[in-house]
Amino acid sequence: MANVIKLRKGLDINLKGKASKDVALQVSETDEYALVPEAFVGVTPKVVVREGDHVSAGDALFVNKACPEVKFASPVSGVVTAIERGDRRKVLCIKVKADAEQTSTDFGKKIVDVMDGDAVKQALLEAGLFGYINQLPYAVSTTPDTTPKAIFVSTLRDMPLAADFEVELLGNEQAFKTGLTALSKIAKTYLGAGVNQPNVALMASKEVELNIFDGPCPAGNVGVQVNHIDPVNKGEVVWTVDPAAVIFFGRLFLTGKVDLSKRVAVAGSEIKTPGYAEVLVGTPLSAFVVDQLKTTEHVRVINGNPLTGTQASLASYVGGHTSEITAIPEGDDKDEMLGWILPRTDQFSTSRSYFSWLFGKKKEYALDARVKGGERHMIMSGEYDSVLPMDIYGEYLIKAIITGDIDKQEQLGIYEVSPEDFAVAEFVDSSKLELQKIVRDGLNTLRKENA
């Protein structure tokens, strides 16, 4: 029997343009793919290929400079055409021109049931998939020298316009189950699901503990689930794995090959027919997003969801952890005379500042990317905690990070949080602070101090 955890704090933001599971979007043919190191937080990339080299799917394109054992696999076979760099020679992406006939490095099929934790780790390291595992504390890509006390997989995606994992699971049930079994060989594994995810619930086994989360966003955040099941104390480590990566792991053990294909949601109020596209990690957005845009002007394209994603362009690529591509109005062409004094029935407000609350919680909004205000002092106390379903004092933690008080940060639970946990708090924040950036900077500083 699954353990049901009910959460009251949080906020569901209902945006127009949710992806329909019945709409399969066309993906234009492309021979250019790219792996973006920035998608793997905490990794300093060291490129191990040169322009002109031929690679097979599964061969390493770059490694983690701090831990060269952790490789990152090419999604396709082909010729390396470019290694793009930015300021201070930062690696932006490694481009590969795909072969007409794809070839994959064969790592050999494996029977997960007879493997131990070390064998599972080694298999993931060899295939260039280990870097898809993240860790708490610090919310970064992990390394094999860490020993997790538990592993968490959250299949509940409840951020606005987020992809439904039930759609991605269709046809990948065996791979997902195999991936979960493999992770359970390393440490106790917890599977988090929502109340409306019956297919995910069927994936649970005796090796994996199933927990059902019932509550508003951000109940699906893996950090929230860790906080309610097995909190992280100083000196402890837990691993967190995106469910799409679990499928990658399962395919590796079942076929012996690296297959980085996934179903990505294309959603948002600026999308003609929101749906799902079958793509590879590294697919250019121009191959499946450009034809779906209502207009290419005054549009914010986001690699991810509107709260935690990163601003992208049609020249960007699907990231290693991307589950949706969203498009919302930029808002830079709006001119609202007396906007603050109008009823604004089409605008969302958590404080009932507009009359839109009269239409109920099911009303959908076409929100744009405007901040509508500048940074100001933190005066409204309790705002963050009202939407943060964790046993921490979010407001005091943010203040401790801003002031650089490491001792206070540790006392207030910084080891348990990741930037995405503060995404909803950032949305409701009347002080207009970039809370996710503040948390990320604090975690990076703490990681350097403890290195």
Give a label for each model feature:
Residues 43, 49, 66-69, 273:
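Short, solvent-exposed loop/turn positions at domain surfaces
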Residues 27-29, 79-85:
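Short, solvent-exposed cationic patches
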Residues 43, 74, 90:
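Exposed loop/turn and edge beta-strand positions of beta-sandwich/beta-sheet ligand-binding modules
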Residues 69-77:
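Short coil-to-beta-strand transition motifs
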Residues 1-48, 63, 213:
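N-terminal, Lys/Arg-enriched amphipathic/low-complexity engagement segments
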Residues 49-63, 82:
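Short, well-structured beta-strand-loop connectors
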Residues 70, 84-287, 291-451:
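Buried, small/hydrophobic-residue-enriched core segments of structured protein domains
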